[in-house]
Structure formats: C-alpha cells, structure tokens
Amino acid sequence: DVLDTWFSSGLWPFATLGWPNKNKYLNKFYPTSVLVTGFDIIFFWVARMIMFGMEFMNKEPFKDIYVHALVRDEKGQKMSKSKGNIIDPLELIEKYSADALRFTLLSMASPGRDVKLSEDRVKGYRNFLNKLWNANNFLKVNKCDFNKTSKTPKILININKWIYGELIETKNIVEKNIKDYRFDEAARNVYQFVWHSYCDWYVELSKTILYSKDQKAIKEVREVSSYIFKQILILLHPFIPFVTEEIWLKNKLDNSKKIFLMLTNWPKGKSKRDKNFKEVKKMINMI
C-alpha cells in the first residue's frame, strides 16, 4: 500500500506530545483549544487529525477550527511569479510598517472570503497609525497626565459622558467579536471608534473646553481624554502591538508596576448612559 505524505501528519496533535506513552504533556496539552488553518488542507490534514484523534485518544484534538482566508492580489487572482502580481510583505512592512500590514489583513479577514490585498489599503491603515500618533501628541501638548488616570475619572460634562459610553460600547462589541473569531469586525469596530468618535469628534469638541478659562472643566477633560486614550491603546494592542507599545512606553504608562502594555488587563467598566448622553449622540449623528 502507498500512503500520501499527509497520512502520518494526522497523528501530529498527540504524537508530538510523547504518544503512545502517557505523560504530563499529553494530559495537559491534548486536546487543545483552537486550530488555525487554510481551507485547502481541511481534507488532507484537519479531517485526518480529527479521525485519528477519535480513534487513538477518544477525543477530538481541538474544540474550534478557524479557517483563515488566503491572500490574493487586488483583483482576486492567485499570486505567482509568472503573472508578476506577487506582493512582497517584507517590502510593505519596510514601507508602511508591520502594524499597518497586520491591521490591513485583520480588517479584511472576513469568514469565507479571500483577502484581495492592495498597497493602497495598507497605505490607508498606515494613515490610521499616524492619526493615533497625532492624538497622543495632542494630549501631551494639552498637558494631559496619563499617570493620574488609572481609575475611571469622575464624569460630569456631556461630551465626556458620551465618549465614555462609546468606549464601553466599543469594548463590549470588540470583545465579543474576538471571542467569535470575527477579527475583521473587531478591527473595524475599534477603527471607527478611534478615528471617528475619538479623533474626529471628541478631540475637536474638547478643544473648546481646553482653550477656555474654566479650570474645573479643563481638569475633567484632561483626565477623561487621557483615560480614554489609555483604554484605546489597550483595545488596539492585539491588532497593532508595535506602535501601541511604543506610545505606552514613551508616556511611561506603568500603573500597578506593569511596565509593558502587553501585561495590562483588558478594559473594564459599565456604560453610564443618561438623557444627556443620548442627546449628544443624536446631535453627532445628525451632523
């Protein structure tokens, strides 16, 4: 009999852990939680791992299977040297950054669809990174002290209530989409919040207070704007880890002795909705 090269690879989930001998690694790591793979090897590899797992271990090797998209050119064609349509990821990283390429691929990773990659899309997400960097500079220029905002600040001003409510709403939907493996939706959710709600609306509306003489209002806006921005960095970190970590370290955001952003807890909090919140949101939607 002749077996193809994929046959023995079906044993991989447990053969790599010392099987057929029983040991602590096999007990700890089998079964695992999720397998990430492409649709082109579902039959050749994934199906056989499940069949062998059930046969020899009496358990399926993983709970979830995440089938990721394949990357094609902007017209949906398979990349090949003969067609001359290959996009070198290293060149894109050198030109636009690893985070820009990473965010592009995540935002386009819709279930059941291949990624039609173009340089213009990567360039667009590079602009998003610039937007985030400029927002950080705006806060620093306006004397927003990040290290005084580890706890949710007291919120009285309407625009602050609005942006805090938007933050919690975004956090909840991003969290749900990540758990559901909808990374494209999660990326778009946080993108919309940062670019439109925070940068386009909140920052611009807050300028009228920051440039006023109302010291009490100025203090609240400084605290809320920096608090929200810190939560933004945490929300964005799974998508764009390099620039968010860089901003975090530059601002020395080391609350609770957690020097690195990657060690920080996921944002928590409940939305403080009231009549004024709804009125501000309605006004913004109308404009």
Task: Describe the predicted segments one by one.
Residues 73, 106, 145-172, 204-287:
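Acidic, turn-prone loop/beta-hairpin segments
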